[in-house]
Amino acid sequence: MVTVKLYGMAYSTCTKRVYTTAKEIGVDVKIVPVDLMKGEHKEPAYLDNYHPFGVIPVLEDEDGTKIYESRAISRYLVAKYGKGSSLLPSPSDPKAYGLFEQAASVEYSSFDPPASSLAYERVFAGMRGLKTNEELAKKYVDTLNAKMDGYERILSKQKYLAGNDFTLADLFHLPYGAMVAQLEPTVLDSKPHVKAWWAASLRVIPGRLLRNSSKEFM
């Protein structure tokens, strides 16, 4: 089995995004912890050798190839090791590939900003000893609810965001989506097609896999 190194942290949603992708295509992951609280991600050696902007995660492949940014890492893993997987349509099929990139762009531009901001206010701020700004948190919830109107329109016509197959575009939602589902359940269960999509996505990638990603860092 292929084994890759993943530099990251247990509670990093972006680290979980890569871990989940790797496990879905049968790639083993060796976790290399990067302690954000100690500032290890800002040390010169890390900046020079792993991530020029000093964030996580970073993948190191068996041949020494290093890739950073969680969505880029996930695409790389599936392109190299997930042959035949529906997670990433082949560029040789322009329509399927274009619809996938469209859906992936929706996650990146419409879902991630308010979802990650809500998670920061309600969870990560407290981990840093900061108080939650409830006014901001409510703003992010309102934004997510408005975005779900667009999701409902898409998902009323197809099972998943890029069509009728589960792809990375759906998987990319899972780490922050799991947090949103706990923090504000109505965001993902108040609209019938969004609710069905979320349930179907969790059947493909069980919640236990997202939880287990943290255990490998211990």
Swiss-Prot record:
One Pfam family of this chain: GST_C
Gene3D superfamilies tied to this protein: 1.20.1050.10, Glutaredoxin
GO terms for cellular component: cytosol
Enzyme Commission number(s) from the entry: 2.5.1.18
Tissue and organ expression note: Expressed in vegetative rosettes.
GO biological process entries: toxin catabolic process
Subcellular location: Cytoplasm, Cytosol
Catalysed reactions, as listed in the record: RX + glutathione = an S-substituted glutathione + a halide anion + H(+)
Ranges where the GST C-terminal domain occurs: 93-218
SUPFAM superfamilies reported for this sequence: GST C-terminal domain-like, Thioredoxin-like
Binding, glutathione: 12-13, 41-42, 55-56, 69-70
Protein keywords: Cytoplasm, Detoxification, Oxidoreductase, Peroxidase, Stress response, Transferase
GO molecular function: glutathione transferase activity; peroxidase activity
Residue ranges constituting the GST N-terminal domain according to the UniProt record: 2-85
Family: Belongs to the GST superfamily. Phi family.
Role summary: Specifically catalyzes the conjugation of synthetic 1-chloro-2,4-ditrobenzene to GSH. Also functions as a glutathione peroxidase, converting linoleate oxidation products into their corresponding hydroxyacids. This enzyme may thus serve to protect the cell from oxygen toxicity as well as from exogenous toxins such as herbicides.
Name recorded for this polypeptide: Glutathione S-transferase PM239X14
Source species: Arabidopsis thaliana
